[in-house]
């Protein structure tokens, strides 16, 4: 039996006040609908039907390369009508899981619990109990005694509910699992004879009860999982909830967060033990932190690997880079893609490294640019040093071998190799290879002019 996931994503989202389709608004730098798609994959979906409407070009530009079956809902006539558009792509023996593109925080474990609750040839719906259920469809059950729950007999929408039904605090989330054959039959029976004039997907629950089909329920661990975002205030609330959840995962994995409410996780972060993360740190993409790593305030880490005992000092940007054991960068350092710091290497403030390897114990303390370079072990790079790697058309490599000392304000015009043990005098411009243990100085000879007078300001 295949798992066929239907994701409803046709709404415009008028209250967002945006040209962007509602489901493309981001949580943690990823669109809401992408979160839902990713979770659908995690539960083992065999096919995903994406029901779309408004903003088709933008949706396809964002999601087009993925394995999705695009299903057009030309008119938005309700959730039942939306799912009905996907009917031709649903086999009788499919299990159909219905999700919503603007409910991004739904968890894999919750959907697995829902599918586990699915009776044979029956229906499983995801419900939640709210202290204030205003605006939501209510779960109607048969009367029962004591603490036992009655059987689900239907779902009544807020606008169609009686005064007694409005007292029910178990609400419908809209998420459900349904056998494909029965779903198609029930969808064909839907009517829009209701206060909204829409085809409610929820009406199939009453049909299932009338047909004698078993209906079971499951509930999420937290109600926030099933909340949607209809405006930017709600979007921000979901963002904070997502960040709180991700911060908790890091702490449980061994990270110490100086303030869990001041961290942004916009990707997948893996941490070792005794990691220290200061405030206002941003993680994007895939980031791995080893044991005893320290991340300073305001740092930004993007798609990088940080080994044990390494330190990222405040306000550094580390992107597509690797730091070895006990290496350090910052404060205010920038490591661009292809940068690699070996064990005990140090990159200091206002140093930029791009597509360069910095060897064991080597240091560039301040105010340097190191691009397209291979730097050996035990090298000292003086302040103001630049690898001149670009000739206006092509990039060229600078090689600095072990134990080289580069004086301040040195320009290395690539391609060039500085051999082991060489010393480059401050202010030099190096255009040719340097041999082992050589001292090279290219600056202009110093002149002393006696009797020279400094200009004075002319009084007007």
UniProtKB/Swiss-Prot annotation:
HAMAP family, alphabetized: GlmU
Catalyzed reactions: alpha-D-glucosamine 1-phosphate + acetyl-CoA = N-acetyl-alpha-D-glucosamine 1-phosphate + CoA + H(+); N-acetyl-alpha-D-glucosamine 1-phosphate + UTP + H(+) = UDP-N-acetyl-alpha-D-glucosamine + diphosphate
Quaternary state and interactors: Homotrimer.
Pathway: Nucleotide-sugar biosynthesis; UDP-N-acetyl-alpha-D-glucosamine biosynthesis; N-acetyl-alpha-D-glucosamine 1-phosphate from alpha-D-glucosamine 6-phosphate (route II): step 2/2; Nucleotide-sugar biosynthesis; UDP-N-acetyl-alpha-D-glucosamine biosynthesis; UDP-N-acetyl-alpha-D-glucosamine from N-acetyl-alpha-D-glucosamine 1-phosphate: step 1/1; Bacterial outer membrane biogenesis; LPS lipid A biosynthesis
Highest taxon of the lineage: Bacteria
CDD domains: GT2_GlmU_N_bac, LbH_GlmU_C
Similarity remark: In the N-terminal section; belongs to the N-acetylglucosamine-1-phosphate uridyltransferase family.
Keywords annotated in UniProt: Acyltransferase, Cell shape, Cell wall biogenesis/degradation, Cytoplasm, Magnesium, Metal-binding, Multifunctional enzyme, Nucleotidyltransferase, Peptidoglycan synthesis, Repeat, Transferase
Positions that bind Mg(2+): 102, 230
Region (N-acetyltransferase): 254-460
Lineage of source species: Bacteria, Pseudomonadati, Pseudomonadota, Gammaproteobacteria, Alteromonadales
Name of protein: Bifunctional protein GlmU
EC category name: transferase
Cofactor needs: Mg(2+)
